[in-house]
């Protein structure tokens, strides 16, 4: 029984695996101000709510060190198991970038998750929608080749609302048409259709440089963009959690 935890800048995903089956999945707000005791209460309540058995092991991927520290302590105190934080060496990947230490844990774990899918060319492009959107190029059997980082769609929408006097906050749903007839539809066109064009363009450029690849989309915005991005071969919102499971099973 593995508790897999993906700590992102905006939200934290938690998945409980029994063998290779994901039996429970939660998402909570990432709060840098929460203490270990608060995370312990949250975890206790979530497990009680679903009547879940305690994990036998825990593995964390994190891009937020303060939250990582408190979450690790909370898991260890509540369940009495060691909560390991994934390092690059744990992934078994050959990280072929200028400074391998710069590669985010979530991106490397995504790469491990992607490699579980069959790819006709042995290459993968992973698109992860979060606070930032990342594009990563991966090659079988275990090579991480680099990628690109862009602003996340919700981050872009929040920035527009915060830094302009008259533009409102909106929900990121696809518009009826590219040519908006009011401010809300114009914003949705720019933020949703514009973002789809960004994704399609980046994937095309990756393929021009590296060759054909299996494109896997993950993160909260992936499902919204699925009908707008024909470049997606797979949408897997649990890719990071599955990558953590694979590391746990293969590396111990």
Swiss-Prot record:
GO terms for biological process: coenzyme A biosynthetic process. The active site is at residue 106. Pathway: Cofactor biosynthesis; coenzyme A biosynthesis; CoA from (R)-pantothenate: step 1/5. Pfam families: Pan_kinase. ATP binds at residues 6-13, 131. It catalyses: (R)-pantothenate + ATP = (R)-4'-phosphopantothenate + ADP + H(+). Its cofactor is NH4(+); K(+). Its EC number is 2.7.1.33. Belongs to the type III pantothenate kinase family. This is Type III pantothenate kinase. It comes from Thermus thermophilus (strain ATCC BAA-163 / DSM 7039 / HB27).
């Amino acid at each position: 029984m593995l508790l897999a935890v993906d700590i992102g800048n905006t939200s934290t995903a938690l998945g409980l695996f029994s063998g290779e089956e994901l039996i429970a999945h939660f998402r909570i707000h990432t709060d840098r101000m929460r203490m270990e005791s608060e995370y312990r209460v949250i975890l206790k309540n979530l497990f009680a709510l679903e009547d879940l058995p305690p994990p036998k092991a825990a593995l964390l991927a994190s891009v937020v060190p303060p939250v990582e520290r408190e979450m690790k302590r909370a898991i260890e105190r509540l369940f009495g198991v060691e909560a390991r934080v994934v390092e690059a060496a744990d992934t078994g990947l050959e990280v072929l970038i200028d400074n391998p230490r710069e590669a985010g844990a979530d991106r490397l774990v995504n790469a491990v998750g992607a490699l579980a899918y069959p790819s006709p060319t042995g290459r993968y492009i992973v698109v992860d929608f979060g606070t930032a959107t990342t594009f990563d190029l991966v090659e079988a059997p275990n090579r991480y080749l680099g990628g690109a980082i862009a602003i996340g769609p919700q981050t872009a929408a929040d920035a527009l609302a915060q830094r302009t006097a008259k533009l409102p906050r909106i929900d990121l749903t696809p518009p009826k048409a590219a040519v908006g007839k009011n401010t809300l539809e114009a914003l949705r066109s720019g933020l949703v259709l514009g973002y789809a064009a960004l994704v399609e363009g980046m994937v095309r450029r990756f393929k021009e440089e590296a060759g054909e690849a299996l494109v896997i989309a993950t993160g909260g915005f992936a499902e919204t963009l699925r009908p707008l991005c024909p470049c997606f071969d797979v949408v897997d919102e649990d890719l990071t959690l599955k990558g953590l499971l694979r590391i746990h099973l293969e590396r111990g």
